[in-house]
Amino acid sequence: MAEEHNHNHEEENIIWITNEEGKEEAYEILFDFDSEDFDKSYVLYFPAGKGEDEEIEILASSYIQDEEGKQGQLKPVETDEEWDMIEEILATFLADEDEE
């Protein structure tokens, strides 16, 4: 995963992540949510520019937002329990999307 992460809500749900080579890559935010159980905020995102018919890899990170709410730092998901919770929320989100 990239060493430095920027989380910016101002660019229409796009975040820019600096990869290992120092290049910035755009990712589109699928959704974000807060967990009271883990006392963290999470964001689910995927590479920007993918078509609706393309299979995409959805990534997840926890994040700490700055005081202004404009940027923040992405952090890795640390435990299996967090992953289980994220997968359950994602499954619910995708099921709701299919119903629409």
From Swiss-Prot:
HAMAP family: UPF0473. Belongs to the UPF0473 family. This is UPF0473 protein lmo1501.
